[in-house]
Amino acid sequence: MSYDRAITVFSPDGHLFQVEYAQEAVKKGSTAVGVRGKDIVVLGVEKKSVAKLQDERTVRKICALDDNVCMAFAGLTADARIVINRARVECQSHRLTVEDPVTVEYITRYIASLKQRYTQSNGRRPFGISALIVGFDFDGTPRLYQTDPSGTYHAWKANAIGRGAKSVREFLEKNYTDEAIETDDLTIKLVIKALLEVVQSGGKNIELAVMRRDQPLKILNPEEIEKYVAEIEKEKEENEKKKQKKAS
């Protein structure tokens, strides 16, 4: 029997192949990074180069779900659009029903449950996306969650998904400290440094969004990103000079 044809059939060694193939689709997607700071959450995404005549504003990997929650994704953009639309409707429905915005965990659990349902019924296939969901709860606590195509979700301090996730995650494990997220600017720089591990052409291929407590999502413009990249390059040069002085 071909176990990779039926979505609801386990292989003898316990695999659901269609779910694993969806996870492979995520690994081919653009790299996305999320970092939870003290009073800020930051999402960064590797931007693919667009066609010369294409409007790049229509190619977005970061979007707001509600005033206090936003998400970045890696994987199939068309699948992400369905998940985003469903999540936005759920956020609005929650506001109308209980007159409060959703918590970040609530909407993460909703998205994870939606994905999980698509792994358990015939005539459907799993969503080929992983998502980083960030925001603030109404007590002002910053949150970062990650979901995958199987419908599992976890809370993180910092995480990465997509093509370069492994090397970016290794970078974050080494460099994420309380000092590294002491200020908003340092948190933003940490995300940019993490993305520069896999993005070759500097700031012009990075999309960055920040959300601060009681403030809406802000997408940074290319000039702001280039300013941070220039500061990072300058810091690198100064550190190299210090190392050379010590060596001599």
From Swiss-Prot:
Q: Which residues carry this modification: Phosphotyrosine?
A: Y153
Enumerate the Gene Ontology biological process terms.
proteasome-mediated ubiquitin-dependent protein catabolic process
What this chain does, per the record?
A: Component of the 20S core proteasome complex involved in the proteolytic degradation of most intracellular proteins. This complex plays numerous essential roles within the cell by associating with different regulatory particles. Associated with two 19S regulatory particles, forms the 26S proteasome and thus participates in the ATP-dependent degradation of ubiquitinated proteins.
N6-acetyllysine: residues carrying this PTM: K227
User: Gene name on record?
Assistant: PSMA7
Tell where it localizes. Cytoplasm; Nucleus
Question: An example Gene Ontology cellular component term from the record?
Answer: cytosol
Q: Which domain of life is it from?
A: Eukaryota
State the name under which the record lists this protein.
Answer: Proteasome subunit alpha type-7
Glycosylation sites (chain numbering): S130
Q: Name one Pfam family in it.
A: Proteasome_A_N
Query: NCBIfam families recorded for this chain?
Result: PRK03996.1 (NF003075)
